[in-house]
């Protein structure tokens, strides 16, 4: 059994958003083909994403400097527990499906916030001999994205290079 984490990063619903329609159809077809797999849908606009701010950074610094989790304030513990839950969910998933529109040639800000939160040194990457090295091996990812133009499957190399969000997720 695999765990599939669907990260929906679109503020609109399926009745007006092509990527959401395609994402929902993909999940339905996947579930029919793999009924034993667990599918977890995380809607970044419905459920929100904890923002990285001075409070989180202060809490992370305290932990790095030797403060125990129990010594943190109740508010700091609540904040970090939400972040840790999202990180663990991401780390333990076997497959990822990112569903998003292309905004300004990139990904929506909530998806970037989410990735900043879950891609963490020592958990998802380490500093290797030749630079950063990922630690989440043998995982698969799919990016379902709609855009207002054609950026792939074109002879125009310039247009293909403008899809920064897809390249970023790779």
Q: Where in this protein do the model-derived segments appear?
A:
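FMN-binding flavodoxin-like domain, especially the glycine-rich phosphate-binding loop
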Residues: 33, 79-88, 109-170
